[in-house]
């Protein structure tokens, strides 16, 4: 039985020349695999069946793959003469239907039709077993490059390779510095900049060139995670993310940076990392002119202009600019720490925290400050440190105008305005602005006091307390008041200086009385509840 208004295979297939394929990042190749797997599933669901393909192997020769898949689709139908049409999938015909006015070519063997002689001839050879003179001379690859002697099955593959061989990349992106060897490559790439792809996400409006990529993306919003790790049970939205995660268990890394020795799972990751050494930032924001190392970074940055935060926590309603931040935030509710240090067993919420921690064991600090020579474990730490020399504070609070060196400091400060306390004690329900405060508070329940004074043996719940205490033995008072010269052991000087400035930032919500310290305000507020 034939399906009415069924799509042609080319409408759902994704194709690249072998040379375009060679230029793709592993992450882009992984996307291809995802798309083809989804295509197989979708076509199977409408009655088309064939043997399960090993896409991992077959995507190495995608163009020949599509011919095989067409044949398998034909074989799966009841009649051998299925009426399936064959379009030659040229570079700029990807994901498009056959253009009107093109004369079809009919196979004399089985009666099937195709729009191009190349696709028809390929099909006839499949029917008759006929091999052309070029085929007999060079085997399956009749087109041979004079420079490198590499041979190709298809003319367009040969032509694309010829450009790659001569380093010719005539197509460049106006939005960024990327260059491409074919018109189709730049068209697909421009969708990322323009956001005008034909398939849009129902939830956030993000545009995609292919339907299947859009469907995979929507899983971020729906929470569907069909791919599960057998070792730890963690689930993922995409099949390609799973093997990357599995490397956290095996410790396998594919590439190592020659500059600093850091290891990476994919060549695309190491290419991006190398820019931290060279200083190359090919992606520029049109609104503010700021430049970035990676495309994902500029996409994330653009949301600071639009204020867009499409990823919302179902538990507390907090919104985020990217899915990974929501995922990381979710672990503050669950307490999950899936990434464990092999040397000391300490667990972390995300891989970046683990990687940062692991460097404390090696003491490797490849990034040196040019002004003072201080070494750092990663480029981002060096960048933040350099602000101590320049005095730069790029992160400003929209509520009060206060500026900060670090974005994380701004985020924490904003909680003083919103009153948000996302970290709650499971034992008594008390909530805290900072996770570190919760961690210290939990020791009041457990009785754990890991910091002991070497002079008198007194123990403390947090490191700052023991630092202040030790100064009672040494007599050190590093904090001096600018107004009266009085010195202090701790940063209590902040409260003291308010006695000179008259600043009282903590106000009672009931009567409006203001206080220098938050603890004084809280104590006062209790007088209202007692008087009731």
Swiss-Prot record:
GO biological process, one term: regulation of transcription by RNA polymerase II
Source superkingdom: Eukaryota
GO terms, molecular function: DNA-binding transcription factor activity, RNA polymerase II-specific; RNA polymerase II transcription regulatory region sequence-specific DNA binding; zinc ion binding
Zinc fingers typed C2H2-type, residue spans: 103-130, 143-165, 171-193, 199-221, 227-249, 255-277, 283-305, 311-333, 339-361, 367-389, 395-417, 423-445, 451-473, 479-500, 506-528
Domain KRAB, residue spans: 7-78
Cited Pfam families: KRAB (PF01352), zf-C2H2 (PF00096), zf-C2H2_4 (PF13894), zf-C2H2_6 (PF13912)
GO CC annotations, alphabetized: nucleus
Record localization: Nucleus
Disulfide bonds: none
Function: May be involved in transcriptional regulation.
Sequence similarity: Belongs to the krueppel C2H2-type zinc-finger protein family.
The name this protein goes by in its record: Zinc finger protein 20
